Design a protein with these regions (language model features):
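Rossmann-fold cofactor-recognition segment
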Residues: 40-50, 69-71
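Short amphipathic alpha-helix with an adjacent loop that forms part of the alpha/beta core around
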Residues: 51-61
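Glycine-rich "substrate-gating" loop/helix at the edge of Rossmann-like oxidoreductase active sites
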Residues: 142-151, 171-180
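Alpha-helical substrate-binding/gating segment
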Residues: 158-168, 175-190
């Protein structure tokens, strides 16, 4: 398959691209970053907020698009409106941060969303994809850990475990959360 990965040279993207390459897919990576691209991929350098950069994708045909870097609905609109529309599936990495604080588990697509969340653009993107009838799958992972993680929160947690330090739990101590490994997230997305 011909695959476009938006943001494929860091953490989740790096794990995903590695697994896709193991399945012998033809991969284009669109990134603004300075990380080197993996062998056997085509790096397309550009800022997804810049229409001139997005035009580099204009005449390319993809079977699947993995969007790891999208944060705002305008970014997704710009991308999709400038792509050949023959792709079969748009796979979007959202966030569990779109949900309101909720003590009823498990969460589902119908669970209340936090319209003031810093992840508001993620659920606005999902709503736009539904409205436009674009074939998509959205993943809403929680805290992701694993090789290449650049977020301090998850590393802080494991550092405390490794050094046998206590891990403070907010409120009355009954709060639960779940961490997911980057490799598991990549597997389920494929």
């Amino acid at each position: 398959m011909k695959i476009l990965v938006m943001g494929g040279t860091r953490f989740v993207g790096k794990s995903l691209v590695s697994k896709l390459l193991n399945q012998n897919h033809d991969i284009d990576i669109f990134t603004r970053g300075n990380k080197s691209n993996p062998d056997n991929t085509n790096l397309i350098k550009g800022d997804r907020n810049d229409i001139e950069c997005i035009h580099k994708l204009k005449n390319k045909k993809y079977d699947v698009i993995f969007d790891i870097s999208g944060r705002e609905v305008e970014q997704t609109k710009l991308l999709i409106e400038n792509l050949d529309d023959s792709f079969h599936r748009y796979i979007y990495v959202s966030s569990a941060g779109v949900y309101k604080d909720n003590y009823e588990l498990p969460l589902s697509e119908e669970s209340p969303l936090d319209t003031n969340s810093r992840h508001k653009g993620k659920f606005e993107t999902e709503n736009w994809l539904v409205e436009k009838k674009i074939p998509f799958t959205s993943f809403r992972p929680t805290y992701i850990y694993g090789p290449g993680n650049y977020n301090k929160i998850e590393n802080w947690f494991f550092e405390r475990l490794f050094h046998l330090k206590s891990i403070p739990i907010p409120a009355d101590g009954s709060l639960i959360t779940q961490l997911g490994h980057v490799s598991d997230l990549s597997d389920v997305m494929i």
